[in-house]
Protein backbone atom coordinates (compact mmCIF):
# COMPACT_ATOMS: atom_id res chain seq x y z
CA UNK A 1 0.00 0.00 0.00
CA UNK A 2 1.25 3.50 -0.82
CA UNK A 3 2.57 5.44 2.14
CA UNK A 4 1.56 8.94 0.96
CA UNK A 5 -1.84 9.54 -0.59
CA UNK A 6 -5.18 11.36 -0.34
CA UNK A 7 -8.42 9.58 0.53
CA UNK A 8 -11.91 11.10 0.55
CA UNK A 9 -15.19 10.07 2.18
CA UNK A 10 -18.59 11.75 2.37
CA UNK A 11 -21.47 11.85 4.80
CA UNK A 12 -25.04 13.10 4.56
CA UNK A 13 -27.36 14.38 7.27
CA UNK A 14 -30.62 12.93 8.54
CA UNK A 15 -32.44 15.43 6.31
CA UNK A 16 -30.90 14.16 3.08
CA UNK A 17 -33.75 12.68 0.98
CA UNK A 18 -32.32 9.15 1.03
CA UNK A 19 -31.73 9.36 4.77
CA UNK A 20 -35.31 10.52 5.35
CA UNK A 21 -36.34 7.27 3.66
CA UNK A 22 -33.88 5.19 5.68
CA UNK A 23 -35.25 6.75 8.87
CA UNK A 24 -38.87 6.03 7.92
CA UNK A 25 -38.08 2.43 6.96
CA UNK A 26 -36.23 1.83 10.23
CA UNK A 27 -38.97 3.47 12.29
CA UNK A 28 -41.35 0.87 10.88
CA UNK A 29 -38.98 -1.97 11.80
CA UNK A 30 -38.78 -0.52 15.31
CA UNK A 31 -42.57 -0.21 15.47
CA UNK A 32 -42.97 -3.94 14.86
CA UNK A 33 -40.40 -4.80 17.52
CA UNK A 34 -42.00 -2.34 19.98
CA UNK A 35 -45.56 -3.53 19.44
CA UNK A 36 -44.78 -7.25 19.25
CA UNK A 37 -44.22 -7.90 22.97
CA UNK A 38 -47.31 -5.87 23.88
CA UNK A 39 -49.41 -8.14 21.67
CA UNK A 40 -47.75 -11.34 22.84
CA UNK A 41 -45.90 -11.87 19.56
CA UNK A 42 -42.54 -13.61 19.85
CA UNK A 43 -39.88 -11.14 18.63
CA UNK A 44 -38.15 -14.04 16.86
CA UNK A 45 -41.22 -14.29 14.61
CA UNK A 46 -41.29 -10.64 13.53
CA UNK A 47 -40.42 -9.84 9.92
CA UNK A 48 -40.08 -6.49 8.21
CA UNK A 49 -38.71 -5.42 4.85
CA UNK A 50 -39.78 -1.84 4.25
CA UNK A 51 -38.79 0.37 1.32
CA UNK A 52 -39.61 4.08 1.23
CA UNK A 53 -39.77 6.65 -1.54
CA UNK A 54 -40.08 10.34 -0.72
CA UNK A 55 -40.65 13.25 -3.07
CA UNK A 56 -42.51 16.56 -3.03
CA UNK A 57 -45.16 16.20 -0.31
CA UNK A 58 -45.39 12.46 -0.94
CA UNK A 59 -44.15 9.36 0.89
CA UNK A 60 -44.69 5.84 -0.45
CA UNK A 61 -43.92 2.81 1.73
CA UNK A 62 -43.88 -0.70 0.27
CA UNK A 63 -42.67 -4.06 1.46
CA UNK A 64 -43.35 -7.24 3.36
CA UNK A 65 -44.02 -7.64 7.06
CA UNK A 66 -45.20 -10.08 9.70
CA UNK A 67 -46.10 -9.07 13.20
CA UNK A 68 -48.84 -7.91 15.55
CA UNK A 69 -52.17 -6.79 14.14
CA UNK A 70 -51.86 -3.72 16.35
CA UNK A 71 -49.43 -2.28 13.77
CA UNK A 72 -52.14 -0.64 11.69
CA UNK A 73 -51.81 1.75 8.77
CA UNK A 74 -52.89 4.54 11.09
CA UNK A 75 -50.14 3.72 13.57
CA UNK A 76 -47.54 3.50 10.79
CA UNK A 77 -48.63 6.86 9.39
CA UNK A 78 -48.36 8.44 12.83
CA UNK A 79 -44.81 7.12 13.24
CA UNK A 80 -43.84 8.38 9.77
CA UNK A 81 -45.15 11.89 10.44
CA UNK A 82 -43.38 11.99 13.80
CA UNK A 83 -40.10 11.01 12.14
CA UNK A 84 -40.39 13.71 9.48
CA UNK A 85 -41.22 16.26 12.18
CA UNK A 86 -38.23 15.19 14.28
CA UNK A 87 -35.92 15.57 11.28
CA UNK A 88 -37.25 19.10 10.92
CA UNK A 89 -39.27 19.32 7.72
CA UNK A 90 -41.90 22.03 7.82
CA UNK A 91 -41.40 23.54 4.36
CA UNK A 92 -44.06 24.05 1.70
CA UNK A 93 -42.83 21.21 -0.51
CA UNK A 94 -42.37 18.68 2.30
CA UNK A 95 -44.17 19.10 5.61
CA UNK A 96 -44.69 16.44 8.26
CA UNK A 97 -48.29 17.52 8.77
CA UNK A 98 -49.48 17.68 5.15
CA UNK A 99 -47.40 15.14 3.19
CA UNK A 100 -49.48 12.45 1.49
CA UNK A 101 -48.48 9.00 2.80
CA UNK A 102 -49.23 5.77 0.91
CA UNK A 103 -48.68 2.51 2.81
CA UNK A 104 -48.39 -0.60 0.64
CA UNK A 105 -47.21 -3.31 3.03
CA UNK A 106 -48.23 -6.97 2.71
CA UNK A 107 -47.28 -10.33 4.28
CA UNK A 108 -43.88 -11.90 3.67
CA UNK A 109 -43.67 -14.43 0.84
CA UNK A 110 -44.36 -17.98 2.02
CA UNK A 111 -41.48 -19.21 -0.16
CA UNK A 112 -39.02 -17.01 1.73
CA UNK A 113 -40.60 -17.74 5.11
CA UNK A 114 -40.22 -21.51 4.75
CA UNK A 115 -36.43 -21.16 4.65
CA UNK A 116 -36.12 -18.53 7.33
CA UNK A 117 -38.66 -20.07 9.72
CA UNK A 118 -37.08 -23.51 9.92
CA UNK A 119 -36.54 -23.13 13.67
CA UNK A 120 -40.22 -23.34 14.56
CA UNK A 121 -41.79 -25.98 16.86
CA UNK A 122 -41.43 -29.39 15.25
CA UNK A 123 -38.76 -28.30 12.78
CA UNK A 124 -35.55 -30.31 12.58
CA UNK A 125 -33.10 -27.79 11.23
CA UNK A 126 -31.77 -24.35 12.06
CA UNK A 127 -33.21 -21.01 11.03
CA UNK A 128 -31.85 -20.14 7.59
CA UNK A 129 -30.54 -16.87 6.20
CA UNK A 130 -33.19 -14.56 4.77
CA UNK A 131 -31.26 -14.21 1.51
CA UNK A 132 -27.99 -15.04 -0.15
CA UNK A 133 -25.20 -12.49 -0.18
CA UNK A 134 -21.77 -11.36 0.90
CA UNK A 135 -21.16 -8.99 3.80
CA UNK A 136 -18.02 -7.16 4.86
CA UNK A 137 -16.80 -5.82 8.18
CA UNK A 138 -13.83 -3.54 8.66
CA UNK A 139 -11.87 -1.87 11.43
CA UNK A 140 -8.61 0.05 11.68
CA UNK A 141 -6.75 1.96 14.38
CA UNK A 142 -6.94 5.40 12.72
CA UNK A 143 -9.53 6.76 15.19
CA UNK A 144 -10.63 5.94 18.76
CA UNK A 145 -13.74 4.20 17.41
CA UNK A 146 -11.56 2.06 15.12
CA UNK A 147 -12.99 3.62 11.97
CA UNK A 148 -11.28 5.12 8.91
CA UNK A 149 -10.52 8.80 9.52
CA UNK A 150 -12.27 10.29 6.44
CA UNK A 151 -15.72 8.84 7.15
CA UNK A 152 -15.33 9.29 10.91
CA UNK A 153 -14.76 13.03 10.57
CA UNK A 154 -17.26 13.53 7.74
CA UNK A 155 -19.95 12.11 10.05
CA UNK A 156 -18.74 14.13 13.03
CA UNK A 157 -18.98 17.44 11.17
CA UNK A 158 -22.63 16.93 10.25
CA UNK A 159 -23.55 15.45 13.61
CA UNK A 160 -22.28 18.57 15.42
CA UNK A 161 -24.16 20.88 13.07
CA UNK A 162 -27.31 18.77 13.47
CA UNK A 163 -27.08 18.97 17.25
CA UNK A 164 -26.78 22.76 17.03
CA UNK A 165 -29.75 22.95 14.66
CA UNK A 166 -31.96 20.80 16.89
CA UNK A 167 -30.97 22.82 19.97
CA UNK A 168 -32.17 26.00 18.27
CA UNK A 169 -28.68 27.50 18.07
CA UNK A 170 -28.64 27.39 14.26
CA UNK A 171 -32.22 28.19 13.29
CA UNK A 172 -31.27 29.42 9.81
CA UNK A 173 -29.91 26.02 8.76
CA UNK A 174 -32.21 23.40 7.27
CA UNK A 175 -32.22 19.63 7.74
CA UNK A 176 -30.54 18.68 4.44
CA UNK A 177 -26.75 18.68 4.22
CA UNK A 178 -23.69 16.83 2.97
CA UNK A 179 -20.03 16.81 3.94
CA UNK A 180 -16.88 15.48 2.32
CA UNK A 181 -13.41 15.26 3.83
CA UNK A 182 -10.17 14.62 1.93
CA UNK A 183 -7.53 13.31 4.33
CA UNK A 184 -3.78 13.39 3.73
CA UNK A 185 -1.97 10.17 4.65
CA UNK A 186 1.77 9.87 5.30
CA UNK A 187 3.36 6.49 5.92
CA UNK A 188 -0.14 5.05 5.85
CA UNK A 189 -1.35 7.26 8.73
CA UNK A 190 -3.81 10.20 8.57
CA UNK A 191 -1.99 13.47 9.28
CA UNK A 192 -4.16 16.30 7.94
CA UNK A 193 -7.09 17.50 5.87
CA UNK A 194 -6.49 18.72 2.32
CA UNK A 195 -10.06 19.59 1.28
CA UNK A 196 -13.35 20.15 3.12
CA UNK A 197 -16.77 20.24 1.47
CA UNK A 198 -19.99 21.17 3.25
CA UNK A 199 -23.22 21.78 1.37
CA UNK A 200 -25.93 22.85 3.79
CA UNK A 201 -29.54 23.83 3.28
CA UNK A 202 -30.37 27.33 4.53
CA UNK A 203 -33.81 28.62 5.44
CA UNK A 204 -33.19 32.24 4.47
CA UNK A 205 -33.30 32.26 0.69
CA UNK A 206 -30.72 34.95 0.00
CA UNK A 207 -27.98 33.64 2.31
CA UNK A 208 -24.61 33.66 0.57
CA UNK A 209 -22.02 30.88 0.66
CA UNK A 210 -19.86 33.10 2.87
CA UNK A 211 -22.72 33.53 5.34
CA UNK A 212 -23.30 29.78 5.45
CA UNK A 213 -19.56 29.28 6.02
CA UNK A 214 -19.71 31.61 9.02
CA UNK A 215 -22.34 29.30 10.48
CA UNK A 216 -20.76 25.92 9.77
CA UNK A 217 -17.01 26.57 10.02
CA UNK A 218 -16.88 26.50 13.85
CA UNK A 219 -18.42 23.01 13.86
CA UNK A 220 -16.03 21.78 11.18
CA UNK A 221 -13.07 23.00 13.22
CA UNK A 222 -14.50 21.47 16.39
CA UNK A 223 -14.92 18.12 14.65
CA UNK A 224 -11.41 17.87 13.22
CA UNK A 225 -8.07 17.55 15.04
CA UNK A 226 -6.80 21.11 15.42
CA UNK A 227 -3.46 20.52 13.70
CA UNK A 228 -5.15 18.97 10.68
CA UNK A 229 -6.71 22.24 9.44
CA UNK A 230 -4.10 24.70 8.17
CA UNK A 231 -3.92 27.67 5.83
CA UNK A 232 -3.34 25.14 3.05
CA UNK A 233 -6.68 23.43 3.67
CA UNK A 234 -9.13 24.21 0.87
CA UNK A 235 -12.75 24.90 1.83
CA UNK A 236 -15.83 24.41 -0.38
CA UNK A 237 -18.95 25.64 1.42
CA UNK A 238 -22.16 25.57 -0.65
CA UNK A 239 -20.09 25.68 -3.84
CA UNK A 240 -23.18 26.06 -6.07
CA UNK A 241 -23.93 29.35 -4.28
CA UNK A 242 -27.43 28.49 -3.04
CA UNK A 243 -29.09 25.58 -1.21
CA UNK A 244 -32.55 26.82 -0.20
CA UNK A 245 -34.76 24.03 -1.60
CA UNK A 246 -33.75 20.86 0.21
CA UNK A 247 -34.91 17.42 1.22
CA UNK A 248 -37.35 15.31 -0.80
CA UNK A 249 -38.82 18.47 -2.34
CA UNK A 250 -35.50 19.18 -4.04
CA UNK A 251 -34.45 15.63 -4.83
CA UNK A 252 -36.43 12.39 -4.52
CA UNK A 253 -35.19 9.93 -1.91
CA UNK A 254 -35.12 6.14 -1.64
CA UNK A 255 -34.23 3.68 1.10
CA UNK A 256 -30.83 2.05 0.77
CA UNK A 257 -29.04 4.47 -1.54
CA UNK A 258 -26.31 5.57 0.88
CA UNK A 259 -24.64 2.24 1.61
CA UNK A 260 -21.09 3.65 1.53
CA UNK A 261 -22.03 6.49 3.88
CA UNK A 262 -23.62 3.86 6.14
CA UNK A 263 -20.43 1.81 6.33
CA UNK A 264 -16.76 2.77 5.83
CA UNK A 265 -16.79 5.62 3.33
CA UNK A 266 -15.26 3.50 0.59
CA UNK A 267 -12.24 2.46 2.67
CA UNK A 268 -13.42 -1.16 2.67
CA UNK A 269 -15.35 -3.44 0.29
CA UNK A 270 -19.14 -3.55 0.37
CA UNK A 271 -21.29 -6.56 -0.44
CA UNK A 272 -24.02 -4.38 -1.99
CA UNK A 273 -26.86 -4.96 0.45
CA UNK A 274 -28.47 -2.03 2.26
CA UNK A 275 -29.39 -2.10 5.95
CA UNK A 276 -32.37 0.15 6.65
CA UNK A 277 -35.88 -1.24 6.64
CA UNK A 278 -34.73 -4.81 7.28
CA UNK A 279 -35.31 -6.96 10.34
CA UNK A 280 -32.27 -8.96 11.52
CA UNK A 281 -33.24 -12.18 9.72
CA UNK A 282 -31.92 -10.32 6.69
CA UNK A 283 -28.20 -11.10 6.74
CA UNK A 284 -27.54 -8.02 4.61
CA UNK A 285 -27.95 -6.23 7.91
CA UNK A 286 -27.25 -8.63 10.76
CA UNK A 287 -24.23 -10.35 9.21
CA UNK A 288 -22.71 -6.99 8.24
CA UNK A 289 -23.08 -5.99 11.90
CA UNK A 290 -21.46 -9.27 12.97
CA UNK A 291 -18.61 -8.77 10.50
CA UNK A 292 -17.92 -5.29 11.88
CA UNK A 293 -18.11 -6.64 15.43
CA UNK A 294 -15.53 -9.33 14.73
CA UNK A 295 -13.20 -7.07 12.74
CA UNK A 296 -13.36 -4.42 15.46
CA UNK A 297 -12.60 -6.95 18.18
CA UNK A 298 -9.61 -8.27 16.23
CA UNK A 299 -8.16 -4.75 16.05
CA UNK A 300 -9.14 -3.96 19.65
CA UNK A 301 -7.32 -7.13 20.73
CA UNK A 302 -4.15 -5.86 19.08
CA UNK A 303 -4.17 -8.76 16.61
CA UNK A 304 -4.07 -6.37 13.62
CA UNK A 305 -3.95 -2.66 12.83
CA UNK A 306 -6.42 -3.14 9.96
CA UNK A 307 -8.87 -5.95 9.38
CA UNK A 308 -11.31 -6.75 6.59
CA UNK A 309 -13.68 -9.66 7.22
CA UNK A 310 -16.07 -11.22 4.71
CA UNK A 311 -19.03 -13.51 5.41
CA UNK A 312 -21.15 -15.28 2.79
CA UNK A 313 -24.63 -16.83 3.11
CA UNK A 314 -27.24 -18.71 1.06
CA UNK A 315 -30.98 -18.30 1.52
CA UNK A 316 -32.40 -20.96 3.82
CA UNK A 317 -28.92 -22.13 4.90
CA UNK A 318 -27.92 -21.36 8.47
CA UNK A 319 -24.13 -21.62 8.50
CA UNK A 320 -22.01 -19.09 6.61
CA UNK A 321 -20.63 -20.51 3.38
CA UNK A 322 -17.27 -18.87 3.98
CA UNK A 323 -15.32 -16.67 6.38
CA UNK A 324 -12.43 -14.62 5.00
CA UNK A 325 -10.05 -12.29 6.85
CA UNK A 326 -7.42 -9.93 5.43
CA UNK A 327 -5.23 -7.97 7.87
CA UNK A 328 -3.44 -6.09 5.09
CA UNK A 329 0.02 -7.06 6.27
CA UNK A 330 -0.62 -5.75 9.81
CA UNK A 331 -1.64 -9.01 11.48
CA UNK A 332 0.00 -10.37 14.60
CA UNK A 333 -1.41 -13.84 13.89
CA UNK A 334 -1.95 -15.84 10.68
CA UNK A 335 -5.18 -14.96 8.91
CA UNK A 336 -6.35 -18.58 8.77
CA UNK A 337 -5.91 -18.72 12.55
CA UNK A 338 -8.06 -15.61 12.94
CA UNK A 339 -10.71 -17.12 10.66
CA UNK A 340 -10.83 -20.20 12.86
CA UNK A 341 -10.97 -18.40 16.21
CA UNK A 342 -13.73 -15.96 15.21
CA UNK A 343 -15.90 -18.85 14.02
CA UNK A 344 -15.32 -20.55 17.39
CA UNK A 345 -15.93 -17.37 19.41
CA UNK A 346 -19.31 -16.48 17.86
CA UNK A 347 -22.21 -18.46 16.43
CA UNK A 348 -22.49 -16.96 12.95
CA UNK A 349 -25.85 -18.48 12.04
CA UNK A 350 -28.58 -15.83 11.61
CA UNK A 351 -30.12 -16.89 14.92
CA UNK A 352 -26.71 -16.93 16.63
CA UNK A 353 -25.97 -13.40 15.44
CA UNK A 354 -29.36 -12.11 16.56
CA UNK A 355 -28.89 -13.69 19.98
CA UNK A 356 -25.25 -12.64 20.50
CA UNK A 357 -25.88 -9.01 19.48
CA UNK A 358 -29.43 -8.90 20.94
CA UNK A 359 -30.92 -7.63 17.69
CA UNK A 360 -34.62 -8.46 18.26
CA UNK A 361 -35.23 -4.98 19.66
CA UNK A 362 -36.45 -1.56 18.47
CA UNK A 363 -32.92 -0.20 17.97
CA UNK A 364 -32.81 0.62 14.28
CA UNK A 365 -34.06 4.17 13.69
CA UNK A 366 -31.01 5.53 15.54
CA UNK A 367 -28.73 3.83 13.01
CA UNK A 368 -30.33 5.51 10.00
CA UNK A 369 -28.03 8.54 9.88
CA UNK A 370 -24.37 9.29 10.63
CA UNK A 371 -23.27 5.71 10.08
CA UNK A 372 -24.08 2.28 11.43
CA UNK A 373 -20.49 1.87 12.63
CA UNK A 374 -18.14 3.86 14.82
CA UNK A 375 -21.01 4.64 17.20
CA UNK A 376 -21.27 4.26 20.97
CA UNK A 377 -23.25 1.29 22.35
CA UNK A 378 -26.20 2.57 24.39
CA UNK A 379 -28.16 1.34 27.38
CA UNK A 380 -31.13 0.33 25.23
CA UNK A 381 -29.10 -2.20 23.25
CA UNK A 382 -28.32 0.03 20.30
CA UNK A 383 -25.01 -0.43 18.47
CA UNK A 384 -24.23 -3.63 20.36
CA UNK A 385 -21.99 -4.61 17.44
CA UNK A 386 -19.63 -1.78 18.45
CA UNK A 387 -18.73 -3.47 21.74
CA UNK A 388 -15.22 -4.86 22.15
CA UNK A 389 -16.19 -7.51 24.69
CA UNK A 390 -14.77 -10.28 22.52
CA UNK A 391 -11.25 -8.83 22.32
CA UNK A 392 -9.83 -10.72 25.30
CA UNK A 393 -11.44 -13.96 24.14
CA UNK A 394 -9.77 -13.63 20.74
CA UNK A 395 -6.43 -12.65 22.25
CA UNK A 396 -6.39 -15.73 24.48
CA UNK A 397 -7.38 -18.00 21.60
CA UNK A 398 -4.39 -17.13 19.41
UniProtKB/Swiss-Prot annotation:
A biological-process GO annotation: one-carbon metabolic process
UniProt binding sites for Mg(2+): 18
Cofactor binding, note field: Binds 2 divalent ions per subunit.
Flexible loop: region residues: 108-118
Family assignment from sequence similarity: Belongs to the AdoMet synthase family.
UniProt-listed Enzyme Commission number(s): 2.5.1.6
Record function comment: Catalyzes the formation of S-adenosylmethionine (AdoMet) from methionine and ATP. The overall synthetic reaction is composed of two sequential steps, AdoMet formation and the subsequent tripolyphosphate hydrolysis which occurs prior to release of AdoMet from the enzyme.
Pathway: Amino-acid biosynthesis; S-adenosyl-L-methionine biosynthesis; S-adenosyl-L-methionine from L-methionine: step 1/1
Entry GO CC: cytoplasm
Protein species of origin: Nitrobacter hamburgensis (strain DSM 10229 / NCIMB 13809 / X14)
Positions with a binding annotation for ATP: 16, 176-178, 242-243, 251, 257-258, 274, 278
GO molecular function annotations of the record: ATP binding; magnesium ion binding; methionine adenosyltransferase activity
Protein name (Swiss-Prot/TrEMBL): S-adenosylmethionine synthase
Positions bound to K(+): 51
Pfam families per UniProt: S-AdoMet_synt_C, S-AdoMet_synt_M, S-AdoMet_synt_N
Xref: SUPFAM superfamilies: S-adenosylmethionine synthetase
Keywords: ATP-binding, Cytoplasm, Magnesium, Metal-binding, Nucleotide-binding, One-carbon metabolism, Potassium, Transferase
InterPro entries assigned to the protein according to its UniProt record, in alphabetical order: ADOMET_SYNTHASE_CS, S-AdoMet_synt_C, S-AdoMet_synt_central, S-AdoMet_synt_N, S-AdoMet_synthetase, S-AdoMet_synthetase_sfam
Residues that, per the record, bind L-methionine: 64, 108, 251, 282
Subunit record text: Homotetramer; dimer of dimers.
Primary location: cytoplasm
Entry's transmembrane regions: none
Cofactor entry: Mg(2+); K(+)
Catalytically driven reaction(s): L-methionine + ATP + H2O = S-adenosyl-L-methionine + phosphate + diphosphate
Compartments it resides in: Cytoplasm
Amino acid sequence: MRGSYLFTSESVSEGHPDKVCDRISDEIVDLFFSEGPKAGVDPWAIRAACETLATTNKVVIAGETRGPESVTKEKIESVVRAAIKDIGYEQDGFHWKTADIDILLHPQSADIAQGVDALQPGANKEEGAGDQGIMFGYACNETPDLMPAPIFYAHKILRLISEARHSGKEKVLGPDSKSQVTVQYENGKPVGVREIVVSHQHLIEDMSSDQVRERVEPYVREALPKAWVTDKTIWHINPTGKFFIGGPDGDAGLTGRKIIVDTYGGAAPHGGGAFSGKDPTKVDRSAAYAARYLAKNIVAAGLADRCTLQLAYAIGVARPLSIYIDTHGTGKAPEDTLERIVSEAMDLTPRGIRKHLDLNRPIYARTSSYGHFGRTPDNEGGFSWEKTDLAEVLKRAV
